[in-house]
Amino acid sequence: MAKFQAPVINDNPLGWGPCAVPDQFKDMPYQPFSKGDRLGKVADWTGATYQDKRYTNKYSSQFGGGSQYAYFHDEDETSFQLVDTTKMQKTAYQRNRLRFAQRNLRRDKDRRNMLQFNMQTLPKSAKQKERDRLRLQKKFQKQFGVRQKWDQKSQAQLKPRDSSVEVRSDWEVKEEMDFPRLMKMRYMEVSDPLDIECCGALEFYDKAFDRITTRNERPLKSIKRIFHTVTTTDDPVIRKLAKTQGNVFATDAILATLMCCTRSVNSWDIVVQRVGSKIFFDKRDNSDFDLLTVSETANEPPQDDVNSLNSPRNLAMEATYINHNFSQQCLRMGKEKHTFPNPNPFIEDDVDKNEVASVAYRYRRWKLGDDIDLVVRCEHDGFMTGANGEVSFVNIKTLNEWDSRYCNGVDWRQKLDSQRGAVIATELKNNSYKLARWTCCALLAGSEYLKLGYVSRCHVKDSTRHVVLGTQQFKPNEFANQINLSMENAWGILRCVVDICMKLDEGKYLILKDPNKQVIRIYSLPDGTFSSDEEDDDDDEEEEEEVEEEES
């Protein structure tokens, strides 16, 4: 009968596991292993049987392999060392080596592609298409100034512009208005203009200038006539009107500067005088306010040195000189005139009337709401007659070409007759602020037409001799739409400035356009600022006393 035999149990009273190693397991070699090891070998007792070092540790167990590097705490700290793990600073050559290598590879690849393209045989039609493509590409690069470089180092860096007047430490900022906020303003409660007085005499526009082309250009003459650029408070007519009507007074040039200020780039300033409840907008004596800027709004405006022929100030003086001469040369000088009821208020008794420029002054009045009564002195430069004999007033201005190689310009002698739209588009881009001011002045004066003359240098390096290449005529309302000039926004800007000035105390203030930011600021000026001598101060005090007496 089978019986159960209990196995021999080795009891270890002092711990776990067997008391002794069985005889069959004595002297048996053993290597620590892990269950996650790959099973790709039978045995490897030495670890040095592989010739290729890449496979040394591929199939060997890593169990316990790092025990020799284990740290055991001991009283002796001499074996402990700190290792510097900071990265080595690369030299400029090492940093740019990869980028230069990639650029060289691209350049070599482009050369190989170009060589391969030149060696292949193309049919005549394909060759013609490729020549046309290259020609158009060069044309666009020249016209729009395309840069093929990855950086912009080749472009001229814009210099910081100077302020039109130095801001002193004792001037206090009363208000600051940024252009994005002004561009959103609208004002539509503007009454129709009312003519108060008309002064001066106008000469007839010579229509022969409308037939001038680049093939029969006409030299620009130097005409010695007197142009009066009188500020608001020095105008005797405005002084007389201020006693009976109006509470805001200005000239059309000053108002156009404010109404179109969001297009301006250069710095300008306007003096504001608060006398009682009346406001006078003036310009400073001996300032550059009446100079015409050139390429002010271009992407790369002229930035030559002061002594250079094409410095901003020299170009502005040249443009003003051209504008004065052309506005008189295109008239029938010394012949029939259109005379207004009142004479020119700025002609002195000892001055010959024929030496005074053809200009008429129209004093007009607008109502801006119930509290603003605006009186403005506007100007006309000439007049024309229609088929039925009706009289049309004209404002005459001039665009001048100084060097077509700059400011992405086009050659007028090649494009003016065939592509006049491209010429006016380029001028609108480079002289947006100047064209907007001229259009605004024509709208304020009520002129039926705006005449633009195209005048160029005889040679790009000679700023003393010029030729007339053509003329162009616009209606101010239509031209305002073409140049995207919104009169609602212009009136809104003016109303905003007037409201701010109405809240100021009596005194003298300055509206200054920041030379390098799209911001205009209003500063309060101490007494006596911008006063040339004591006589000017006495005249201002007498004027203030007269206005206060009328108000009382």
Swiss-Prot record:
The keyword RNA-binding applies. Residues 532-552 have a biased composition (Acidic residues). GO terms for cellular component: eukaryotic 43S preinitiation complex; eukaryotic 48S preinitiation complex; eukaryotic translation initiation factor 3 complex. Keywords: Cytoplasm, Initiation factor, Protein biosynthesis, RNA-binding. It is found in: Cytoplasm. It holds the Pfam family eIF-3_zeta. It comes from the Eukaryota. GO terms for molecular function: mRNA cap binding; RNA binding; translation initiation factor activity. Residues 526-552 are annotated as: Disordered. One of its GO terms (biological process) is formation of cytoplasmic translation initiation complex. Its main location: cytoplasm. Residues 288-302 are annotated as: RNA gate. PANTHER family: EUKARYOTIC TRANSLATION INITIATION FACTOR 3 SUBUNIT 7, EUKARYOTIC TRANSLATION INITIATION FACTOR 3 SUBUNIT D. mRNA cap-binding component of the eukaryotic translation initiation factor 3 (eIF-3) complex, which is involved in protein synthesis of a specialized repertoire of mRNAs and, together with other initiation factors, stimulates binding of mRNA and methionyl-tRNAi to the 40S ribosome. The eIF-3 complex specifically targets and initiates translation of a subset of mRNAs involved in cell proliferation. In the eIF-3 complex, eif3d specifically recognizes and binds the 7-methylguanosine cap of a subset of mRNAs. Component of the eukaryotic translation initiation factor 3 (eIF-3) complex, which is composed of 13 subunits: eif3a, eif3b, eif3c, eif3d, eif3e, eif3f, eif3g, eif3h, eif3i, eif3j, eif3k, eif3l and eif3m. The RNA gate region regulates mRNA cap recognition to prevent promiscuous mRNA-binding before assembly of eif3d into the full eukaryotic translation initiation factor 3 (eIF-3) complex. Belongs to the eIF-3 subunit D family. This is Eukaryotic translation initiation factor 3 subunit D. It comes from Xenopus tropicalis. The gene is eif3d.
